[in-house]
């Protein structure tokens, strides 16, 4: 077993009271610190308090200690061990030090996974969380944003959420009205992290086709041809984006053409939706720009 201890700290040009007030909003609806939507938000099953359970993404933990305005410790859920903690330390001159510590006992396999895959992403997520503290707390704002390493970018791309198959949503009224009797329909869905756009117009770049109809939460794209017509619906509902495709063939040539295309269609739909999802997440403003900072 190896003891992994990972420490990040930064001096913030703001009082510990200001930074502590930001810390107390972690995991709330107006959380100004979680580096979402590029990273999964920190979510708990209740208010920030000892005993609250939650995590970010697939990392699960519970609040084992909480000193309001001063620090939080999260213990990893079994079978994992160890903890990670975020603390504010007062300094002279109306400044403070923010420190994040992760400590865990790891076997060889876990250590290799941590070293090669998880650590670059962990380092980046923590530094971006501290970036948000500096953005929100310091009168001069963020001096120098953290720069991602190549490995962190690669690993984040690899583990980015993948679309899941779903039925055509009932709320996708434009898709349902597109054709009276479509010959094909499918739908792929991704969750929307806090900070991602909820306006369907922001998602029109998923497919480079003509806008056929719009609704408050749905955008319908499509093209018509002599052999087939197709429509693609982008629906925003229940904190998810859903890409629905419906196709109507007109003749034998259309049926033969789509018999070939449908083999590649699921892959291309997932690829384009996932690519747009990632692009819009990186383009979103940071949390302090979306919430009212406590000063």
Predicted regions and their residues:
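Short, hydrophobic/aromatic-rich segments at coil-to-beta transitions
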Residues: 42-51, 66-74, 214-220
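Short, highly charged C-terminal tails/helix-capping segments
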Residues: 131-162, 277-295
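Hydrophobic pocket/interface hotspot
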Residues: 19-29, 63, 74, 98-100, ...
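A short, structured loop/turn motif at beta-sheet edges
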Residues: 13-17, 64-69, 87-97, 214-216, ...
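Well-ordered alpha/beta subsegment
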Residues: 262-282
